[in-house]
Amino acid sequence: ITFHVEAAEKPEEVIELIRATGKMVGISLKPSTSFNEIKPFMDKVDLVLVMSVEPGFGGQGYIENSTARISKIKKYLKDNCLERVQIQVDGGIKLHNAQEVISAGGNILVAGSEVFGSKNPNQVIKDFYTNAHSIQST
């Protein structure tokens, strides 16, 4: 279960409530929110969701500084022995920028408009799969 840090008055309590259900915990970071807002919770979550568009509207373009943000989060996780924390990226994910996002540290990509706006969603999913595996094996 992933929640937006901006929506929680006491993120620690939200994390504890989710953990009590036995579910994995994710914390979401909007483009306008500083990574410093979620740093105190990194050792308590399983996933960081990096929003690479402003939430609320599908089909938006990828915000370019998101790649640097993903790299910064990946470095922080590595430097703090928190590499178990997954980095999910949502917003503007396309076949042409997936390699950049994965190379920066994205483990899970959300590609709604690219897949479901396609005439052949199955082929787009296969292309993502092929591209992701070729990137990870290099």
Description of each model-found segment:
Residues 1, 25, 108-109, 115:
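A short hydrophobic/small-residue beta-strand
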Residues 1-86:
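Conserved anion-binding
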Residues 33-45, 91-109:
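Catalytic cores of alpha/beta
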Residues 48, 73, 90, 101, ...:
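Conserved, mostly hydrophobic/aromatic
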Residues 56, 115-116:
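Short histidine/acidic/glycine/proline-rich micro-motifs that form metal-
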Residues 102, 116-138:
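C-terminal helical cap(s) of enzyme catalytic domains, especially alpha/beta-barrels
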